[in-house]
Amino acid sequence: MYKRQSITCAKCCPYGQVYAVEYQEQALDILRQNCAYLQAENVTVLAGRAETVLSELPVPDCIFIGGSNGAFPEILRQIQQLPKSVRLVVSAVTLETQAEVTQLLQDAPQLEIIPVFSGQSRKVGRYHVLQPYHPVLLFACTGGKSS
């Protein structure tokens, strides 16, 4: 299911409010459909780019970045200007993104880097082997003014 991170966050925090920011029109449509289908009523879907929309949102407790299309440095700069400390989680798939996020977050308070490996089994003769998918790195840290 495409764009599932926002819905997963919403289901984990049913009394919280999730703001999902997306700039691609097709992805916006899919996200809205998935929210309706899965009754994720506490998700507000916003059209735009995160680096543009972030300043218009209420100050968050947590931020998840599932992709930034090259805007991570600007998004991080805005997060560092928030008036309170927030939990920041960033997923990085490509080597370029992993290197960039590692460099930009290397001095972040409480930084954790968590490699996530997944795969699917497939049959080879009478055996089953695990066909790995690309690893993803999750970066978790504290950001904002009081960090």
Task: List the predicted regions and their residue ranges.
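Short, small-residue-biased leader/transition segments that mark boundaries at the very start
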Residues: 1-2
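A short, conserved alpha-helix within the catalytic core of class I
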Residues: 70-78
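C-terminal substrate-binding/active-site "lid" region of AdoMet-derived donor-dependent transferases
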Residues: 77-133, 137
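S-adenosyl-L-methionine
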Residues: 19-60
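Short SAM/SAH-binding signature in class I
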Residues: 58-67, 87
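Conserved hydrophobic residues forming the short capping helix/wall of the S-adenosyl-L-methionine
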Residues: 13, 34-35, 105
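Conserved S-adenosyl-L-methionine
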Residues: 11-18, 82-84
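Conserved SAM-dependent methyltransferase scaffold
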Residues: 6-7
